[in-house]
Amino acid sequence: MKPFCVFLTFFLLLAASSKKVDSAETVSFNFNSFSEGNPAINFQGDVTVLSNGNIQLTNLNKVNSVGRVLYAMPVRIWSSATGNVASFLTSFSFEMKDIKDYDPADGIIFFIAPEDTQIPAGSIGGGTLGVSDTKGAGHFVGVEFDTYSNSEYNDPPTDHVGIDVNSVDSVKTVPWNSVSGAVVKVTVIYDSSTKTLSVAVTNDNGDITTIAQVVDLKAKLPERVKFGFSASGSLGGRQIHLIRSWSFTSTLITTTRRSIDNNEKKIMNMASA
């Protein structure tokens, strides 16, 4: 092979290898407020967009109200071609307000579900949080901010943050001090290398609540999912559930170590020929 051809082949293989090393699929968005006509957001159930740009998830005048908001575009959280799983970081703020003559219920859940997710047909009663049937079962992974203790779902006796996997009977919970009218800021991180879902909840007085749990998203969810929020109320339990802001970034490496190694071997063989 002529020297120029050797150099050109070497250069192209090197470029291809470098591209594969850096190849990733990224989804990123940021909502400081919301509007009803935004095509990037899907609404389900009793959602209302307020004039101040907040999303109110439930209808206070309706028994067993359920409302959900989702990012409209599906996100690929793992690859069937490579087996790789995405890592993600999301931050959001919300507010829950008690109302007169009702128990404060039932809370908000940040959830991940199949891309065709809808409010479950049997999702009545506040304890379902709009993501499960009346037995507590569904197809989702979520972080719940629960303000009502439902004994049928083994809730602890206090307000709590819980990590849910296909059920509102949480796999792990920690106590949390929910304050009516307080703006709560949350950061959720999923580290695909350790399969760990970590959550930090900051109340407006500076108190921080943390919780973490190993969750294999590839084993629990399909390749393409949607991210969103849901809330629900019941006959005697209602409160105002507001989503104020939301940012999100996910990264899925789209190449395998094997494909990178193969290119590197080709480069070394060409260099030694």
From Swiss-Prot:
Chain residues that bind Mn(2+): E144, D146, D155, H160
Signal peptide span: 1-23
SUPFAM superfamilies given in the database record: Concanavalin A-like lectins/glucanases
Additional notes on this entry: Binds one manganese (or another transition metal) ion and one calcium ion. The metal ions are essential for the saccharide-binding and cell-agglutinating activities.
Record carries keyword Signal: yes
Family membership noted in the UniProt record: Belongs to the leguminous lectin family.
Protein's organism: Arachis hypogaea (Peanut)
Xref: Pfam families: Lectin_legB (PF00139)
InterPro entries attached to this UniProt entry: ConA-like_dom_sf (IPR013320), L-lectin (IPR016363), Lectin_LegA_CS (IPR000985), Lectin_legB_Mn/Ca_BS (IPR019825), Legume_lectin_dom (IPR001220), Leguminous_Lectin (IPR050258)
Keyword Transmembrane among record annotations: no
Domain of life: Eukaryota
Name this polypeptide is given: Galactose-binding lectin
